[in-house]
C-alpha cells in the first residue's frame, strides 16, 4: 500500500458522513486532506509528550504543506490524562489560540488523546470541527471511529462525554512501527473483538495470520481496514448506541470494571488488556450460563495467550479488590439500565448478543470463581 493509494472506508451518516483513510505516509498529507474537506481553517493539534517526540514534526510539516499553521497543545501520556483537569487545560488552549467554531481541532495520539480532544472539540463554542490522527492500533481500529468522546470519573471509565463525529480519520500505518509491543498487543484485542462479535471468518483469519499482522505489511493494513469497516457498519446503523452498537462493548463491562479496580494504573493494566480479559470472561460466563460451548471460550483464551495478551484476572499484577467490589464497579458501568445488568454475551465465535436482566447473583458467583484468590480461577 503506497501513500498515493490509501484504502478509504466511509462511515455513512448522511450529511455527516466521513472518510477513514488507511495507508502509509498519511501524516505527510494531512494538510492536503484536511484543506480539501475544510478549506481555510486554522487548527490546534492536541497530542501527548511521547507521541509529540515521535510524530509531531512530521504532522506539522504535512499540515504546513496544506497551508495550516497549527497551535500545539501537549498533554502528559496515560489514562489519567482523561480527567476534568486536563479537559480544562485543552479547552483553555483552544480558546487561547482564538480558534473559531469553523476551525479544526486535531487529535494526534492514541485513544486517550482522541477521547479527550474530541470531548474538548465538542464543548468549545458548542462544537468545533474535529479530525482524528490515531497513532496506536487501538485508536486506529476502534476509538477514533464512531464519535464517542469523553473522560473518566473516579466513579468509572468514560462516564462524562459527548458524541462528536470527526470530519476525517487519518490512520497512518507507518506510525505503528514505533509503537511499543505491549501497546500494539492492546490494540490487537480490539481488532480481534470484531471477529468475535459477528465476523467469525475474521477471527479465523487472525488465528492464522496474526504474526503477519504484528510484523507489518499488507496483512496489517488489511486487518485495520476490515476492523474499520466492521465498526463503520455498526455506527451507521446505530450512531447513539440505542441498539446494535452496544455489541461493540463485548468485553468492556468486565474490562472497565478491572480498569477501575486498578485505578487506571497503566503499569498494571491498559485498556486493550482489560478488553482482552473481558472478552475471555464474557465467553467463559456465556459458557457457564449454558449459552455457548466451553470450546469457544477455550479457543478465545488460546488465541489471546498466543499473541501475548492477558486472558484472566490472575494475569493482572498486584492485588485486586474482592468480587463484591468488582460487581460494584460493574453496576456503575454505562451498560446498566435502571439497575438491571446488561452484558454482551455470546452463543459462539461471531455470535455476540445483548443480554439484559442478567442476575447480579450469577455475576457475583462467576466473579468469585474467577477471582485470583479462588482455587477455581485459571
Curated annotation (Swiss-Prot):
The protein's predominant localisation is cytoplasm
GO CC, alphabetical? cytoplasm
Q: Which cofactors does the annotated protein need, by name?
A: NAD(+); Co(2+); Zn(2+)
Q: What class of enzyme is it?
A: lyase
Its subcellular locations are: Cytoplasm
Positions binding Zn(2+) in this chain are: 190, 252, 271
Q: Where does NAD(+) bind?
A: 111-115, 135-136, 148, 157
According to the record, cofactor stoichiometry and binding are noted as: Binds 1 divalent metal cation per subunit. Can use either Co(2+) or Zn(2+).
| Gene Ontology molecular function, alphabetical | 3-dehydroquinate synthase activity; metal ion binding; nucleotide binding
Q: Does the keyword rRNA-binding apply?
A: no
Which keywords appear in this protein's UniProt record, sorted alphabetically? Amino-acid biosynthesis, Aromatic amino acid biosynthesis, Cobalt, Cytoplasm, Lyase, Metal-binding, NAD, Nucleotide-binding, Zinc
Give the GO biological process terms.
amino acid biosynthetic process; aromatic amino acid family biosynthetic process; chorismate biosynthetic process
Electron transport among keywords: no
UniProt-recorded name of the protein:
3-dehydroquinate synthase
Q: Which organism is it from?
A: Mesorhizobium japonicum (strain LMG 29417 / CECT 9101 / MAFF 303099)
Q: What is the lineage of its organism?
A: Bacteria, Pseudomonadati, Pseudomonadota, Alphaproteobacteria, Hyphomicrobiales
Q: Which gene encodes it?
A: aroB
Amino acid at each position: 500500500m503506497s501513500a498515493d493509494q490509501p484504502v478509504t472506508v466511509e462511515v455513512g451518516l448522511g450529511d455527516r458522513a466521513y472518510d477513514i483513510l488507511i495507508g502509509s505516509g498519511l501524516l505527510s498529507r494531512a494538510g492536503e486532506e484536511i484543506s480539501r474537506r475544510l478549506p481555510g481553517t486554522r487548527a490546534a493539534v492536541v497530542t501527548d509528550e511521547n507521541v509529540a517526540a515521535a510524530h509531531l514534526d512530521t504532522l506539522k510539516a504535512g499540515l504546513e504543506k496544506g497551508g495550516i499553521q497549527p497551535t500545539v497543545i501537549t498533554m502528559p501520556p496515560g489514562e489519567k490524562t482523561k480527567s476534568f483537569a486536563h479537559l480544562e487545560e485543552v479547552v483553555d488552549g483552544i480558546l487561547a489560540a482564538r480558534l473559531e467554531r469553523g476551525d479544526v481541532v486535531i487529535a494526534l495520539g492514541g485513544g486517550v488523546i482522541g477521547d479527550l480532544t474530541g470531548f474538548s472539540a465538542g464543548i468549545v463554542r458548542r462544537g468545533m470541527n474535529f479530525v482524528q490522527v490515531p497513532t496506536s492500533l487501538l485508536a486506529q481500529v476502534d476509538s477514533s471511529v464512531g464519535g464517542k468522546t469523553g473522560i473518566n470519573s473516579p466513579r468509572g471509565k468514560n462516564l462524562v462525554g459527548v458524541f462528536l463525529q470527526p470530519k476525517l480519520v487519518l490512520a497512518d500505518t507507518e506510525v505503528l512501527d514505533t509503537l511499543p509491543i505491549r501497546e500494539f498487543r492492546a490494540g490487537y484485542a480490539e481488532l480481534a473483538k470484531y471477529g468475535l462479535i459477528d465476523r467469525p471468518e475474521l477471527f479465523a483469519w487472525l488465528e492464522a495470520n496474526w504474526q503477519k499482522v504484528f510484523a507489518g505489511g499488507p496483512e496489517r493494513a488489511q486487518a485495520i481496514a476490515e476492523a474499520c469497516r466492521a465498526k463503520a457498519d455498526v455506527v451507521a446503523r446505530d450512531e447513539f448506541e440505542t441498539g446494535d452498537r452496544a455489541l461493540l462493548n463485548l468485553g468492556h463491562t468486565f474490562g472497565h470494571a478491572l480498569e477501575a479496580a486498578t485505578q487506571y494504573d497503566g503499569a498494571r493494566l491498559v485498556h486493550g488488556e482489560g478488553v482482552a480479559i473481558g472478552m475471555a470472561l464474557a465467553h467463559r460466563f456465556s459458557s457457564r450460563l449454558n449459552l455457548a460451548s466451553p470450546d469457544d471460550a477455550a479457543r478465545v483464551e488460546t488465541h489471546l495467550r498466543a499473541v501475548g495478551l492477558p486472558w484472566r484476572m490472575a494475569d493482572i499484577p498486584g492485588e485486586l479488590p474482592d468480587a463484591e467490589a468488582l460487581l460494584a464497579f460493574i453496576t456503575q458501568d454505562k451498560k446498566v439500565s435502571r439497575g438491571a445488568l446488561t452484558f454482551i454475551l455470546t452463543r459462539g465465535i461471531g455470535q455476540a448478543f445483548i443480554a439484559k436482566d442478567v442476575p447480579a447473583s450469577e455475576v457475583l458467583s462467576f466473579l468469585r470463581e474467577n477471582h485470583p484468590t479462588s482455587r477455581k480461577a485459571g
